[in-house]
Amino acid sequence: MKMSEIRRNVPVNEQIQLLKRGVVDLVSEEDLKRKIEKGEPLRVKLGADPTRPDLHLGHAVILRKMRQFQDLGHKVIMLIGDFTATIGDPSGKSKTRPPLSLEEARANAESYLAQCRLILRQEPEALEIRYNSEWLEQLGYKDIIGLAAKYTVARILERDDFTKRLSAGTPISMHELLYPLTQGYDSVALHADVELGGTDQLFNNLVGRALQRDYGQEAQVVLTLPLLVGLDGTEKMSKSLDNYIGLTDEPHAMFAGLMKVPDPLLDNYFTLLTDLPRERIEELLAGHPVAAHRELAREVVRAFHPDADLDAAEARFRSVAKGGIPDNIPAVSVPASELNEQGHVSMAKLVVLAGLEPSNGAARKLIQNRGLKLGGETYSDPQGQLTREQLTEGVVIQKGKDKFARLVLEG
């Protein structure tokens, strides 16, 4: 996102109104106001277990809120839960989440942080990056027992997902009961003034607030934001559900994705992903949905790709929407070594090489379900092959409405 000047000495009430935009829970507004009135930069924490290294616009909702704190002169702490990822956060889950190794968590964190930098300020006074293994690995058994003694099992089991699992007879492991305490202890270690999270993290963040009091600290303010609903209009945005728009998507792909946002979600997307004033949002929502989608797409793409040619992205979207094939499709080189003895290569393998599917099995399923086109025509043979001659000339394959690849034989 484009860097702006840090706005210091903004009136307290103005800061509160800006920071409340899009917020679901604020515990409490009075505490936040009192902390800001002290005139010192707040320490604003966001904890993330790097289980998936690729971020999407759903993650951007909270990262944008962190950026707002930064732009007001506060310091945000990006806490990588490399240690807690080895436990597995059960928040909002109907079953135990498989843990990661420390090595896996730290490898994922590198990609995670690189994408966070698309939104967050990088100045040392605005950003601090920490790993909770710094202090959690140092805790001994006595420390853990002491931490566990500060909360009752009854209070932990008040959490909605645990209640549902108990009712369903689904097992809950002891390590899962410790997770909220472990996450809460992070706030103690960091002396956090504010903690951000999705609505599914409200319970855990309130545990942190309570633990800070137990450890003689001033309790953090807890601020939660909604989980962005994905392009399917029903489930939260998720890569595994393929209803997402990635933070690193090309401008044309991001534009096309935003044009597909279901009409009932436009208000939410405008509020959470843009800085447009409320009056302008209501004006757009009262008009034609296509115009509102266009404004949303241009605003969001401009934020993540300040130098992008928005007119070109829109023109490509319109061309594809009419069934056309764009001119500037990225070329994918097909190594000659992929050809068999007859000079053929399977379409499934080409789909994987183009990055349209992760595996040959997924590619064959895509083809079988008539989700792939070759040269604008539906391609439906999951065992089909292309020839050396076809690839030498170059062919265009298409998944869905807006994912294209031009395949050309290397050399």
Curated annotation (Swiss-Prot):
One of its GO terms (cellular component) is cytosol. This is Tyrosine--tRNA ligase. The keyword Transmembrane helix does not apply. A motif ('HIGH' region) lies at residues 50-59. It is an enzyme of class 6 (ligase). It is found in: Cytoplasm. Keywords: Aminoacyl-tRNA synthetase, ATP-binding, Cytoplasm, Ligase, Nucleotide-binding, Protein biosynthesis, RNA-binding. Homodimer. GO terms for molecular function: ATP binding; RNA binding; tyrosine-tRNA ligase activity. The keyword Aminoacyl-tRNA synthetase applies. It comes from the Bacteria. A motif ('KMSKS' region) lies at residues 236-240. The gene is tyrS. Residues 345-409 form the S4 RNA-binding domain. Catalyzes the attachment of tyrosine to tRNA(Tyr) in a two-step reaction: tyrosine is first activated by ATP to form Tyr-AMP and then transferred to the acceptor end of tRNA(Tyr). GO terms for biological process: tRNA aminoacylation; tyrosyl-tRNA aminoacylation. Its EC number is 6.1.1.1. It catalyses: tRNA(Tyr) + L-tyrosine + ATP = L-tyrosyl-tRNA(Tyr) + AMP + diphosphate + H(+). InterPro entries: aa-tRNA-synth_Ic, Rossmann-like_a/b/a_fold, S4_RNA-bd_sf, SYY-like_C, Tyr-tRNA-ligase, Tyr-tRNA-ligase_bac-type, Tyr-tRNA-ligase_bac_2. ATP binds at K239.
